Amino acid sequence: VPKKTIIIKASDYRYPSRDELREVYKTNPDLHAFGYMSAYPMIALISMKKGIKEVHRDDHLQYWDRVLLNRNGMLSRTYYNAMVHYMRGFPDDESAFEHEHYINRIQFDQYAEIFYYHFSTVKDTLGQLLNVYYSMGFDVAKMFFKNVLAKIPDQAVSKAIMDFNVLTEITTEYRNSFTHRTPINYPDSRSTIDHTGDSLIYGSANHNFVKSSVIRDNMESTFIALAGLLDTLKMLLPQKIGGI
């Protein structure tokens, strides 16, 4: 049976409109950074109001907070774009696709995968910020989020992050699969081999995959959970640097 030919034109690609984005904005929270800033760090050092280590810490805290702000922005834009393309419509069952569904699915898949990458960078940036905030001393290149979590002295902060990790456990699995294993959004067409004693049994592919509707729901719950964590941590990690 001849396969169906789908032609996607450049004109089929449409960036989300203002009204479409506004519709997504209405139902989703904002991702906040912590607002750490010190207007005159060198003055504090020269006037001896602060020591070198404290000014150094303040500078790094501001840096990672700006990085967090930027990465929150990238994650948010990716999320909004994915949601718009999902809202434009396509069924989970590809056999039921009409022509306009293909471009919506292609665009959703693209932004969804990028979303999971940005989620990981936001989480790692938060780890870098906590490393500086609590003066843990982890080298930037050797910092792992789980190591930072283990050294957090504040139980309320630790609990907030552990609760977040539970809420986003599937998110992490999706991200790891996209990055290191098979893409979750397309059927796994690989054959299998089962070892039974001295025999090998060749098996057909299982064609398992995660439906777009399930990925969409996970993205939404992840975005809400991250916004909640950042708001909670902003209250638990008061601004401790000068010039505020």
Each model region followed by its residue ranges:
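Hydrophobic alpha-helical segments and helix pairs
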Residues: 76, 80-83, 87
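Acidic, Ser/Thr- and Gly/Pro-rich intrinsically disordered linkers and low-complexity segments
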Residues: 86-94
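Short, positively charged
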Residues: 122
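Acidic, Ser/Thr/Gly/Pro-rich intrinsically disordered interaction regions
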Residues: 2-77, 91-92, 99-110, 128-244
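Extended HEAT/HEAT-like alpha-solenoid repeat tracts in very large eukaryotic scaffold/adaptor proteins
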Residues: 108-119
